[in-house]
Amino acid sequence: RDRSPSRGLGDVYKRQVFSKEGKSGNWVSNNLPHFKKIIDEVAFLKAVHTDQFNHGPAQTFMFTGSARLGRPSLGSWVTYGLGSENANLPGFVVLTSGGAAPDAGKSVWGNGFLPSVYQGVHCRSKGDPVLYLSDPKGVNRSLKQKLIKSINDINLKEHEKFNDPEVLTRINQYEMAYKMQVSVPEVMDINNEPEYIHEMYGVKPGQESFANNCLLARKMVEKGVRFVQLYDYGWDAHGDNEGNSLTAGFLKKCQMMDRPVAALILDLKQRGLLEDTLVVWGGEFGRTPMQENRIGIGNLFVGRDHQGDAFTMWMAGGGIKKGVVHGKTDELGYTGIEGRVSVHDIHATILHLLGFDHEEFTYQFQGRPFRLTDVEGRVINEILS
């Protein structure tokens, strides 16, 4: 049965074109011409659901497994389990774009109750890659090294006295910061990439952009960073102004993400990295299939409200079955009717693909073992190769 675009938005979708692409024959919007090139590389989850409907709690839930603050983020769990492959770079790096931070703040890359060494390091694609990493005037590398050694000698005595693991974390962080002063500027410099790569991603060196961040993500994966997390702000298309309308601002966001996302998958593949890298794309919830009239009568702009009962995510890369679709919604796209998967299911699947049994991967805190998937979650075997 033809289950192409929703009918709930009337004339808006009459102006849109969806087509079946690739060997898989999966539907793609004409607003994503580059994504069509990778359609056979990804597995779609068409009936993801969440019980959170506001941005902050939904983002916290999506990235920590709990809508409440205080739990470790997914990247922290993975870094805790896998460690780092590069002694000169953090194991968990965060890159943001879109002009604003996530609504849930730094909690979505926080370490929660895990040791703070597993917290994500927020890097910037414009200006200093990491705030406060550069030395002040009058401090050279030699003096900095002596200062860190003196501080860490004191910290070691502190650890011998109190046996506090956070002191060891502090020592590691000082040493990592010293190493990062050389390693981070190098890996964050996209000027050293060839022109055809710049064109492939659509990057503009010196600017903060999602395209730049996609290229930086590839560079970091290449250098052995275990977990790279990209956040792009500005997808909240309620239709309360032109920038948030489906017919203007939303289409610009599609154009902004289309080329670099396809480039990232193709670039990883051509370098032989995709089979060992898991790429996950999605948001904290979906949008309603019907129009939202937030402003009221006479609203010139078209938007959609938050919707947690059915939305789409996709995965590609290591261990993922290519070109498959798992899950189905009703004819309006309002609720999932087959193959529903929860946030805990997604976490269980990610951990499984990275080599963990999500039920056994725990951390003891306040007298009991905690895990990312809490007491729920199943591996989505239907999308595994």
Model-derived segments and their meaning:
Residues R1, R7-S385:
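Ligand-binding pockets and gating/stacking loops
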